[in-house]
Amino acid sequence: MATYVLVHGGGHGGWCYQPVARILRAAGHDVYTPTLTGLGERSHLLRADIDLDMQIEDVVQVLKYEDLHDVILAGHSYGGMVITGVADRALDRIAWLVFLDASTPKNGESLADRAPPIMVAYEEVRTVDGVEVVLGPDSKTNPFLGVTDPEQLAWMTPKLTPHPWKCFSQPISLSNEAAVRALPRASINCTPTLKAKPPETRAEALDADRVWEIDTGHDLMLTEPQAVADALLAIAA
């Protein structure tokens, strides 16, 4: 039995992993899908001090209080920033890092540095309850998610929540970068995203112990949950 912790990306919540989590649990594995502070069902906690550090600590605390070890830790999109920081703080609890169409930051980089498309979202920056936020159900960046099925869109869109911009602009601080880089890692990429990456970033996305490419949109855990689950199951095999 494997233990999976699946970390969502910007504007999402743990809800986005429901289809994948069902498959993994049916196969007998433990699955945790934490929602980061200020998002999803925790959107009522939105406040000005939420940043990348806090959302990294959200997941570190799950590992600690659920007493999790040998974790297959996966992050989607912005979640790649989060899982990299989690591994830095809880190295001894991680068996694999899995990047789901995700950012793979170096020390001192922010998501804004790693993913230029997020700067399109910054054009929509607004203030909600005193917090600078981007994304949400009405964001013009939502087509990038690649969800086109009407039923999926009707289920997903109302659940998208504004995300504090500070999370995307704060550089990650890694104390154990070499050790984090030495962890086994897998990369599950979406074909359209991979093709759009600059050569250097594309090479980094393919530099992993296990690599998959799925021809689907960015929200692959919703559009291709079986393919994502199959890859995650293969990592545990």
Locate predicted features.
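Gly/Ala-rich beta-loop-alpha elbow adjacent to hydrolase catalytic centers
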Residues: 74-75, 79, 83
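Flexible "cap/lid" loop of the alpha/beta hydrolase fold
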Residues: 88, 92-137, 167-168, 173, ...
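Conserved loop-alpha-helix segment in the C-terminal half of the alpha/beta-hydrolase fold
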Residues: 189-222, 234-235
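Active-site nucleophile elbow and catalytic-triad environment of alpha/beta-hydrolase enzymes
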Residues: 158-177, 192-194
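Active-site loop/oxyanion-hole signature of alpha/beta-hydrolase fold enzymes
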Residues: 30, 38-71, 88-89, 116
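Short, proline-enriched alpha-helix->beta-strand connector loops that line the catalytic pocket
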Residues: 179-185, 206-209
